[in-house]
């Protein structure tokens, strides 16, 4: 029989919030008796936007902005019912996007 595994992907613009959320998830899973692999840092997506700042449409004056999306991956191997309940009740910051796959 195959082992049950929960894969959690976290995304955020601020890496400090992301790391603290990952630490909370890992601590909760270990406390309930599950085996944890991670958090594994995934490549950061960098989006660059170039905007013309000249009022008359001159091509020489531009301004660039960038947005970085940091990602982490956590695998929870052989989670019990206590682990799933604890993860459902866990309160994480609003800036973190969570994707869970069973």
UniProtKB/Swiss-Prot annotation:
GO terms for molecular function: structural constituent of ribosome; tRNA binding. The keyword Ribosomal protein applies. Keywords: Ribonucleoprotein, Ribosomal protein. The keyword Ribosomal protein applies. GO terms for cellular component: ribonucleoprotein complex; ribosome. It comes from the Bacteria. Coiled coil: none annotated. One of its GO terms (biological process) is translation. Part of the 30S ribosomal subunit. Belongs to the universal ribosomal protein uS10 family. HAMAP family: Ribosomal_uS10. NCBIfam families: PRK00596.1, rpsJ_bact. Involved in the binding of tRNA to the ribosomes. This is Small ribosomal subunit protein uS10. It comes from Symbiobacterium thermophilum (strain DSM 24528 / JCM 14929 / IAM 14863 / T).
């Amino acid at each position: 029989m195959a082992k049950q595994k929960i894969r959690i992907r976290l995304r955020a613009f601020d890496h400090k919030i992301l790391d603290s959320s990952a630490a909370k998830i890992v601590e909760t899973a270990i406390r309930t008796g599950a085996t944890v692999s991670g958090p594994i840092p995934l490549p950061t997506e960098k989006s660059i936007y170039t905007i013309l700042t000249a009022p008359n449409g001159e091509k020489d004056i531009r301004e660039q902005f960038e947005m970085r999306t940091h990602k982490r991956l956590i695998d929870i191997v052989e989670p019990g019912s206590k682990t799933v309940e604890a993860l459902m009740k866990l309160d994480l910051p609003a800036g973190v996007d969570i994707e869970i796959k069973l």
